[in-house]
């Protein structure tokens, strides 16, 4: 069967790397500011990275949004989560009420949210939740493929379409979030296959499991990989067999952001697994990714290591939802504010600056 995926193929063709010439100009300005070279650390790197993304040395964020993909996972049948599956729909409904972690933090930093039903097992009633349902949850990947290849492509393209739409509406900074009971299991499976690392090293306790439950989760993830035998060279095959609609949709968001040349933030382990998928499809995606925090889930370090990213925050967070994105939005806007408004050495009347050495780590 021939699968139509024109949007995905076009998107992958259009993703180009960051502008190296503008990056050089941005570093030249950053290093001319009235401070020891490198003294603003990660803030300097963020500002310069965004210059390379946009093609402009000075940048401002006009509108920012976290896209939250909500979906259920059939592997919950294996008892891989301490939470009931019905919680996915409830979380989605609470997101739009702005009473969850991501809702409160987004409001605090004046960021918008788009809550998407991409595969919740039930029909949610709140009209503020965008209905992009591919199916009523995935199948139990410990027994069969989680979804068809067609469904995987549809979910990925949903993410691309949403970013395309929001860029046209003026959004120029994106975050990624999710809700999906059991999705730390699917994320661990995807990361294990794409990074070729034993799943036992990647599976974490998620929302909290007993020691017995943790062992069972490891078993279920390993069984899913062994039964489905996903092809590590084919990201769509990996997502279809052992992934989730949320992972696929977020992967599409990363691809869409890279195509549209806007920065996009990784939250925790689920969006990190989706980022790894996007990176494996087109390595240029890396230039548009900003890793918000080092999740307490063990798999995150394998992802950031594989892509070559350094999480900005180390706060022992593991909530998910996209909760790291609003925190990172504030850091990004702070970095751009410094680049745009800080005085240069000359403007600050620091004529003899030879004493200011480069203190960056080599």
Swiss-Prot record:
Pathway in which this enzyme or protein is active: Nucleoside biosynthesis; alpha-ribazole biosynthesis; alpha-ribazole from 5,6-dimethylbenzimidazole: step 1/2
Assigned EC number: 2.4.2.21
Catalytic residues identified in the record: 321
Any GO BP: cobalamin biosynthetic process
Keywords assigned by UniProt, alphabetized: Cobalamin biosynthesis, Glycosyltransferase, Transferase
Pfam family, one: DBI_PRT
Top EC class, one word: transferase
Reaction catalysed by this enzyme: 5,6-dimethylbenzimidazole + nicotinate beta-D-ribonucleotide = alpha-ribazole 5'-phosphate + nicotinate + H(+)
Membrane-spanning residues: none
One term of GO molecular function: nicotinate-nucleotide-dimethylbenzimidazole phosphoribosyltransferase activity
InterPro entries: Nict_dMeBzImd_PRibTrfase, Nict_dMeBzImd_PRibTrfase_bact, Nict_dMeBzImd_PRibTrfase_N, Nict_dMeBzImd_PRibTrfase_sf
PANTHER family: NICOTINATE-NUCLEOTIDE--DIMETHYLBENZIMIDAZOLE PHOSPHORIBOSYLTRANSFERASE
Role of this protein: Catalyzes the synthesis of alpha-ribazole-5'-phosphate from nicotinate mononucleotide (NAMN) and 5,6-dimethylbenzimidazole (DMB).
Family classification: Belongs to the CobT family.
Annotated protein name in UniProt: Nicotinate-nucleotide--dimethylbenzimidazole phosphoribosyltransferase
Organism: Clostridium tetani (strain Massachusetts / E88)
Gene: cobT
